[in-house]
From Swiss-Prot:
Keyword Membrane: yes
Organelle transit peptide residues: 1-55
A molecular function GO annotation: heme binding
Gene source species: Bos taurus
UniProt subcellular location: Mitochondrion inner membrane
Residues at which a ubiquinone binds: 113
Name used for this protein in its record: Succinate dehydrogenase [ubiquinone] cytochrome b small subunit, mitochondrial
Positions of heme b binding: 101
Amino acid sequence: MALWRLSVLCGAREGRALFLRTPVVRPALVSAFLQDRPAQGWCGTQHIHLSPSHHSGSKAASLHWTGERVVSVLLLGLIPAAYLNPCSAMDYSLAATLTLHSHWGIGQVVTDYVHGDAVQKAAKTGLLVLSAFTFAGLCYFNYHDVGICKAVAMLWKL
């Protein structure tokens, strides 16, 4: 009954439901040709914007993505190198790359799942504080204790 009322309000004839006469999903090839043209909506027209936003093609985003990949590849080589040659240079390199890798990864989770400007800004500020304390704590551990590499080796001996 509710669908019939809705279809009558939106102009469907003889009780036909609106979704039966209007395709909801269009193939990608058809949608590509219909960019920024009005499409029939529930009650009138709505604009479908399939083109990417103006900010998504920025150079900064591309460099950030490249930086994330470089850090990930560095970690693939740095972890075995730290196992084979544990020293303070490896400890500090691990502290920096692990903190940066974690910061960027959790930052993407915040961007994807935290909604609202104020809440997202607070979450990103909290993440920045957490990352700073993580890096400072790892550096403190490297300077005043055995370091990351030897600590992991000691854990493996247990």
